């Protein structure tokens, strides 16, 4: 038995350690726990009635909206709750960056693992409504996995189809993994084009993911090579893990405090991320590519 883990849990439940200058920014973790629990509860209820078969998935979502009592409320609460999860997560990460929480590697990396699991869960949720935007978003994202042949073929290959839908539905337990990780969903898309039945022969003018994936989507649009785009996207997440090692980089710490970089880093990240969200939802144009490239260089 791991007595250290038990004592650590008891210490947090009975005598929670917190700084003297505690303020409202320390509420984000608690709010995330509440929203996450509500998401799991609604996700389980919606999973009871949705049919993950190619011919019925879209119509089962419409059945939830129109035929089931208060089904529309559960569906839209689930979609809105997913946005709240990512809003609170991004604010939580920014708070950690501002207060140099990366100096606590165990807590920092544990939180980033929850963030990555949430991203994977939201991606699986793209497929479930099986609307027009769901289908084409999934086609774009799964094609990025062509470097990993086994995963690529398991996701349905170049043609997203019924096996893809069923295999992704199997991974709806991912929120429970994130919940366990946070202790020691499955979301429908809200884009208007997703309320259209899938048409394999009509590619949308502009494939738009949910807003919390738009910075990554802007990165993929900026870099023409799929492999390079995927590597840069992974690097943008990996760099957060590397922040846990900055305690050993004394030169970087001296630079931050000598030139006041700490005070300007978080506002800069907020501004760059906001601009990348805006660029990600725009039609692909040369000007947007240039600005996106500049913003990503500054962000890195």
UniProtKB/Swiss-Prot annotation:
GO biological process: mitochondrial electron transport, ubiquinol to cytochrome c
Subcellular location: Mitochondrion inner membrane
Residues involved in heme b b562 binding: 78
Note on how the cofactor is bound: Binds 2 heme b groups non-covalently.
Main subcellular localisation: mitochondrion
GO function terms (MF aspect): metal ion binding; ubiquinol-cytochrome-c reductase activity
Keywords: Electron transport, Heme, Iron, Membrane, Metal-binding, Mitochondrion, Mitochondrion inner membrane, Respiratory chain, Transmembrane, Transmembrane helix, Transport
Cofactor(s) named in the record: heme b
Misc. remarks from the entry: Heme 1 (or BL or b562) is low-potential and absorbs at about 562 nm, and heme 2 (or BH or b566) is high-potential and absorbs at about 566 nm.
The protein, known as: Cytochrome b
């Amino acid at each position: 038995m791991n007595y250290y883990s038990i004592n650590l849990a008891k210490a947090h439940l009975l005598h929670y350690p917190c700084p003297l200058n505690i303020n409202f920014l320390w509420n984000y973790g608690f709010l995330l726990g509440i929203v996450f629990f509500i998401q799991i509860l609604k996700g389980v209820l919606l999973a009871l009635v949705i049919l993950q078969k190619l011919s019925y998935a879209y119509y089962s979502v419409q059945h939830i909206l129109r035929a089931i009592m208060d089904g529309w409320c559960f569906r839209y609460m689930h979609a809105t709750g997913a946005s709240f999860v990512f809003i609170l997560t991004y604010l939580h990460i920014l708070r950690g960056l501002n207060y140099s929480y990366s100096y606590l590697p165990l807590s920092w990396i544990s939180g980033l693992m929850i963030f990555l699991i949430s991203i994977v869960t939201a991606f699986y949720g793209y497929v479930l409504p099986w609307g027009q935007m769901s289908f084409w978003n999934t086609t774009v994202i799964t094609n990025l996995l062509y470097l990993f042949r086994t995963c690529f073929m398991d996701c349905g290959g170049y043609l997203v189809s019924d096996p893809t839908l069923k295999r992704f539905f199997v991974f709806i337990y991912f929120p429970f993994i994130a919940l366990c990780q946070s202790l020691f969903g499955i979301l429908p898309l809200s884009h208007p084009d997703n309320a259209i039945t899938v048409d394999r022969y009509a590619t949308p003018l502009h494939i738009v993911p949910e807003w919390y994936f738009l910075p990554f989507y802007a990165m993929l649009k900026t870099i023409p090579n799929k492999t390079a785009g995927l590597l840069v996207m992974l690097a943008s997440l990996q760099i957060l893990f590397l922040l846990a090692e900055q305690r050993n980089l004394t030169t970087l710490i001296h630079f931050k405090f000598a030139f006041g970089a700490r005070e300007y880093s978080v506002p800069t990240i907020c501004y760059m991320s906001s601009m990348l969200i805006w660029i990600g939802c725009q039609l692909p144009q040369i000007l947007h590519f240039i600005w996106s490239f500049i913003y990503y260089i500054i962000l890195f």
